[in-house]
């Protein structure tokens, strides 16, 4: 869920001021919800806005000070980057997973490697898969593929 993006402290302060409609130095869940709708075009329920506030509300007052708001924005940016990375990994996984089985087999790995100009035999492909095959089933699931790509 996108909250906002602020690259510098000045931008963070300006963004905080935009979200702080009543100018009291705190952002309520209602202000957060309203600003997410009007500024970002993102609909969130009262409950979701409350959960967002609670996720970074260090002092437990139900409101966000500027530092808490900055933490919320930073967390949203990390989440967004993780989503982008996950989409890219899913697409890459799909290139190797050619047999419609939802996993990368030694055969599908060999096919893709050949397309990329590498002439690995099936035993080499089994050995590559074995290094990241955590459950020992002889194939790579998407989760195992993610681990391999992040290694």
From Swiss-Prot:
Binding site for Ca(2+) 1: 20, 22, 24, 26, 31
Known function: Potential calcium sensor.
Protein name: Probable calcium-binding protein CML31
Domain EF-hand: residue ranges: 14-42, 44-79, 84-119, 120-151
Keywords: Calcium, Metal-binding, Repeat
One GO MF term: calcium ion binding
Keyword Plastid: no
Chain residues that bind Ca(2+) 2: 57, 59, 61, 68
Residues binding Ca(2+) 3: 133, 135, 137, 144
One Pfam family this sequence matches: EF-hand_7
């Amino acid at each position: 869920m996108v909250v906002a993006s602020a690259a510098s402290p000045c931008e963070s302060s300006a963004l905080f001021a935009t979200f702080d409609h009543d100018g009291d130095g705190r952002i309520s869940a209602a202000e957060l919800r309203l600003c997410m709708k009007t500024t970002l075009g993102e609909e969130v329920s009262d409950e979701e806005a409350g959960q967002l506030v609670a996720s970074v509300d260090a002092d437990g007052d139900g409101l966000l000070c500027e530092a808490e708001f900055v933490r919320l924005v930073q967390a949203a940016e990390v989440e967004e980057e993780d989503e982008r990375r996950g989409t890219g990994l899913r697409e890459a996984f799909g290139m190797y997973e050619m047999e419609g089985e939802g996993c990368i087999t030694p055969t599908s790995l060999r096919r893709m490697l050949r397309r990329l100009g590498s002439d690995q035999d099936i035993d080499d492909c089994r050995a590559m898969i074995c290094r990241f095959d955590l459950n020992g089933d002889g194939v790579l699931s998407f989760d195992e593929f993610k681990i391999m790509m992040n290694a």
